[in-house]
Structures are given as C-alpha cells and as structure tokens.
C-alpha cells in the first residue's frame, strides 16, 4: 500500500476490524518511511458476468433492468419489496456462483422465472407470457396446467 503522504511503498497494518456489518475491512496503517498513519477500507469487488443476448451481442449485467422486469410482473400483486429484493439477491448469487465471465441471457430468464414462481404464480405467468412469447390462449392454458400438475399443488 502506498503512503498517501510520502508515496513510499512500505506500510504496516496496525489494526484491522470488520465494519459495515462485515462487508468491509477497516485497516489502520502506518508508513515505515515517514511515520504517518492513515486508514483504508477494503471491500470485495463482486463482478457479475456479462450477458450474451440471443442475437450474440454482449452487454453488462443490469440489475435495474432485472428489477424493473420483475416489478412489472409483480405489479398489483401481494409481494413485499423485501421478498422481491431477496429474490434479486438469490439470482445474483446464482450468477456469481457459476464462476463464468459470461452467461447466456436465457440463464437469467430461467432464474427469474424460478424466483417468480416461488413468489407469486400470477406474476410468473405474466413474465413467462412475455419471456416465452405466448401467441395465444392455448399457450397460457398449457403453462397454467403445467403449474397445477406440479407436486405440492392442490
């Protein structure tokens, strides 16, 4: 770590502690050249993979776009913001867990549908109808019938 006062490379850590609910490490440092002390904060940089669109183009992951799409599906449904945010965290965690630098947008779409299905089946159908481009009522019926046949449904 470079000393911000003299620019020397030799510094030592005097004290380290977790802050921000364990999300950051605060380090008190001392420069071995000039003796000045300073504080640094370290956070993990968690990068989400880039998305490979169906047309082959690539774009950075956009959390706001993901949130907006899920909010649109959940509009006027009895699902709290907290549950939506938890679903977003779960999706991002699964994307990071792939360890890949790029993932197909289809993977994100499937993760969203899985989370929406857990949150609210009406929202799931809304999202699926756009995502899978349902063309007629028959496709809606087939998806609803598939949902009804799943284990654990009355």
UniProtKB/Swiss-Prot annotation:
Keyword Nucleotide-binding assigned: yes
Segments forming unnamed zinc fingers: 3-34
Stretches assigned to coiled coil: none
GO molecular function: ATP binding; DNA binding; zinc ion binding
InterPro entries registered for this protein in UniProt: ATP-cone_dom (IPR005144), NrdR-like_N (IPR055173), RNR_NrdR-like (IPR003796)
Cofactor binding remark: Binds 1 zinc ion.
Cofactor list: Zn(2+)
Alphabetically ordered keywords of this record: ATP-binding, DNA-binding, Metal-binding, Nucleotide-binding, Repressor, Transcription, Transcription regulation, Zinc, Zinc-finger
Any one biological process term the GO annotation gives: negative regulation of DNA-templated transcription
Domain ATP-cone: from-to ranges: 49-139
Any Pfam family matching the protein: Zn_ribbon_NrdR
NCBIfam families in UniProt: transcriptional regulator NrdR (TIGR00244)
Function: Negatively regulates transcription of bacterial ribonucleotide reductase nrd genes and operons by binding to NrdR-boxes.
Homology family: Belongs to the NrdR family.
UniProt-recorded name of the protein: Transcriptional repressor NrdR
Species this chain originates from: Pseudomonas savastanoi pv. phaseolicola (strain 1448A / Race 6)
